Amino acid sequence: MRIWRVGLLILLFLAVSFLIARWLTAENRERAAVVSLLHLQKEGDSAGMLRMLPGCGQQPKCRAAVVADARRLQGAGTLTVLRYDSGTSYSFAGASGQTRVAWDRGGATPAVVQCVSVERRGLAIFGGSIILHAISLPIGGESTCPG
């Protein structure tokens, strides 16, 4: 009987560990999506950016901002994330918020700070989904994201 209890406790521990790991990886998945969007922006790929921002292409103001950002912030160099402040960090269930990201492409160019509208759907422990809705024009280095 004791072996069954130990076995059950081990299985319970493994199941809980797996669920916690899934919850914690949601942060990495969000960050990867935002960084992919920034890479497209740095490469000047506004069409790729619009594919990552569902609904933005149908909104003239959003579409124009994305095209202008991609054109203005395009450049060579290696993208480096200097600071990443997620508005949805460690959300267990769905959440929406602004993620503030400061990034640099090296060289003499100044750092860029932008806000990305992020939505998490579903439960993080079951994978959930990460949806990016919009990216702001560059904001001041000490500015906060709206909302």
Which role fits each region the language model picked out?
Residues M1-H39, E43, R51:
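Short, low-complexity N-terminal intrinsically disordered segments enriched in polar/charged residues
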Residues L24-T25, M49, S143-G147:
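Unusually extended, aromatic-enriched hydrophobic runs near protein termini
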Residues A26-E27, Q74-G75, I131-L132:
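Intrinsically disordered, low-complexity segments enriched in polar/charged residues with Gly/Pro
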Residues E27-R31, R83, S96, E119:
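Short linear sequence motifs
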Residues A47-G107:
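Short solvent-exposed beta->alpha transition segments
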Residues S89-G147:
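Exposed beta-sheet edge and beta->alpha loop/turn motif
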